[in-house]
């Protein structure tokens, strides 16, 4: 059975590679087809950029596998194939809803290891849960832990989805963040495949409206000049108003102070750009040059299943002298 699954994955991966051997165009979107919830990684091992995402275009957010694309210049993207399939024996605890992944590259001894976190639908039923798979390569193959690492909400409501991983350059400690309807964070153990349960902290930004910063989902954390930046998405992923807001903290587990001007990225109807959110952030290594990677609704599906027809985009993100984030102008 294992051989059959591997053959299936290899065949499917080859099909993707043949269909999208390389994708390049001026402007956005940067990937072919429908993808959402993008996570970007720069690999110190390969000196390439990688994007991981929810495979979109399926009714009811029913995608069941993850693919990965690589690039050396953020413009030309190569399909590396399927790296995790939730409907195969590769992931014994889940059977679908492969959503919103994140990944961390860690130097373990003298070898780079890759820890891939994601949410899936458990075979036992109930709400979504979060799992982890590992690899020696950013493109895989990945081996799942065999069971979820986050199964329940610390608030008693919401979903265990939209996981983010962050390693604090100040301390070397790594953290997970997750939650729809709430934001939770916890320190990871050194093994990167389990959390320190005693550190679980509910840190949902309070207040706001759907027009500014009312928290919905998709936490993302990064560090710059002594501050921890927390980003999140507002409203529903199928809404043109879906957008990104942020706050800051002096600690990786909060509390979070909402920014005076919290909206980072929002729709631009004049350019037919709708629902730009659920982002990750890239700092170009060795520079203070930053990019925001996000999805938006494909304009042709604005009135027909917009929440499952999304496309991945990249734009520059800049800071004011006081460290606040300038509002990003989304581009086509």
Protein language model features and the residues they cover:
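Carbohydrate-active catalytic/glycan-binding domains of CAZyme proteins
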Residues: 23-332
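Bacterial N-terminal signal peptides that target proteins for export
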Residues: 1-12
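Bacterial N-terminal signal peptides
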Residues: 11-21
């Amino acid at each position: 059975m294992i051989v059959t699954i591997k053959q299936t994955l290899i065949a499917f991966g080859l099909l993707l590679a043949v269909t999208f051997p390389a994708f390049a165009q001026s402007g956005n979107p940067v990937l072919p087809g429908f993808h959402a919830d993008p996570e970007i990684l720069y690999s110190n091992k390969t000196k390439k950029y990688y994007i991981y995402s929810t495979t979109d275009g399926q009714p009811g957010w029913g995608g069941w596998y993850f693919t990965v694309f690589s690039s050396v210049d953020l413009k030309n993207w190569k399909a590396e194939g399927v790296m995790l399939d939730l409907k195969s024996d590769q992931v014994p605890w889940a059977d679908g809803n492969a959503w919103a992944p994140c990944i961390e590259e860690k130097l373990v001894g003298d070898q780079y290891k890759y820890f891939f976190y994601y949410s899936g639908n458990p075979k036992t039923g109930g709400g979504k849960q979060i799992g982890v798979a590992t690899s020696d390569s950013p493109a895989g193959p990945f081996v799942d832990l065999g069971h979820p690492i986050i199964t329940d909400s610390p608030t008693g409501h919401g979903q265990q989805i939209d996981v983010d991983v962050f390693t604090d350059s100040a301390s070397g400690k790594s953290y997970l963040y997750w939650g729809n309807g709430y934001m939770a964070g916890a320190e990871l153990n050194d093994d990167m495949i389990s959390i320190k349960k005693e550190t679980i902290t509910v840190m949902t930004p309070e207040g706001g409206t759907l027009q500014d910063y009312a928290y919905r989902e998709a936490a993302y954390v990064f560090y710059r000049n002594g501050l921890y930046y927390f980003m999140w998405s507002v409203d529903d992923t199928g809404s043109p108003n879906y957008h990104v807001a942020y706050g800051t903290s002096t600690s990786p587990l909060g509390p979070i102070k909402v920014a005076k001007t919290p909206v980072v990225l929002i729709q631009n109807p004049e350019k037919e750009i709708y629902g730009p959110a659920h982002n990750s952030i890239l700092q170009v290594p060795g520079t203070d040059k930053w990019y925001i990677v996000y999805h938006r609704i494909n304009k042709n599906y604005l009135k027909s299943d917009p929440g499952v027809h999304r496309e991945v985009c990249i734009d520059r993100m800049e800071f004011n002298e006081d460290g606040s984030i300038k509002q990003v102008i989304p581009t086509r």
